[in-house]
Amino acid sequence: VLLILSDLIKVKGLIMKYRLLYLVLDGMADSINDEVTTLELADKPGLDELARKSICGLMYTVGKGIAPESDEAVISILGYDPHEVYTGRGPIEALGAGLNIREGYEVAFRANFATINPVTRKIIDRRVGRNLSTSEARELARALDNMEISIHQGYAKVVATIGHRAVVVIGSRTRKLSPMVSNNDPAYQRKGLVSIAVENPKPYVEPITPLDNSEESKAAAEIANAFFEKAVEILDKHPVNIKRVENKLLPANALLLRDAGGSIPKATPLGVKYNCRFSLLAEMPVEIGIGRAFGAEVIPLEPPTGDPRVDYEKRLNTTLKALEKHDVVYVHLKGPDEPGHDGKPELKKQKIEEIDKYYVQPLLSYLDKYAIIVTADHATPPSKKTHTDDPVPILFYMPGLLPDNIEKFTEKNCMRGSLGILEHGWLLLPTIIEKYLKN
């Protein structure tokens, strides 16, 4: 996460000297128990130079023992306790995709187009080999959108977002529904409204079940399961999938559902919380939805072109323009997370190096103007192929600040920094503001 602070920002009556750029490198961290981490292997002179001029530390982005999903982690590092405000990932993704939820009668899920054996329900690939194009996904979603479901006068709305990702909203015209239902995606286990990443999950679709004894939860589970079955029938015969199979590609013949929610989070907006003009730059629906839900001015980033130089130069230019108009600019860069999930350490290393070369290094020429924090929303070690509960590194730079003399920006080096170890991500901004930025 990269934080840039500028002239005379008032936060809770305090005066901050600098505008704030808050840059999150999604899934950048690995496990502190790994023999060697991606940050240790990466050639990243920009981040290392920042580290040498900064104070450093580690942070559990939600809490010890919690391997967070991205949404609850981002909510936390923005300064909110997700246990108090979180309503499930589904509504946040829906908001990011432009869908509104009819509270009480609709439940939103984050969904993955996936490949399954339609007879045994064995999951072959949770993400369709990561090669489902957004245009293919949108065509498949159109075949499912506005589906009528016979039970409880139900219906479903389906929107494809980016790649294999989608949002599914189920509803009933006659029954109230509750989001207290399980996931059918075995990679994430529901605990209340929060999902926890599961190491080595069983590769089978699980029926969605109510998490309490209410009729509303039972009805929601029944509609969701009926939607899943009908979706498999439609998708398995869809021309997009027939063509994919002919081309020796995996078919996107199922939707894995997780993280149900029935309402948008209600919390003090970011601009009010920090008494500043707060903007958020992101490309993924989940971060866009968080920005909208928590009152930031959202600046959507263009989808990646595949050319990292072009992509990160555009993102940096957008960042600098946003800093001309806003006191705090949160920037979320996705790069390192996917190769972590896919168990590809060399590709994760490459993604970090690309961000360093084309985004961070050019940013160094602005060190006289800004203070900077760099961190991650969670760890995604290639050794585990999932989010883990490991703490993530933080660096904080501000002109005139006495540095910790950390030579390289890595998990183990940051452990020795003067920021110490923050037990919760929601402590980061208040700590920095109170301890270092107040005049």
PLM regions: where:
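Feature captures the catalytic ectodomains and active-site-proximal regions of enzymes
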Residues: I4-N439
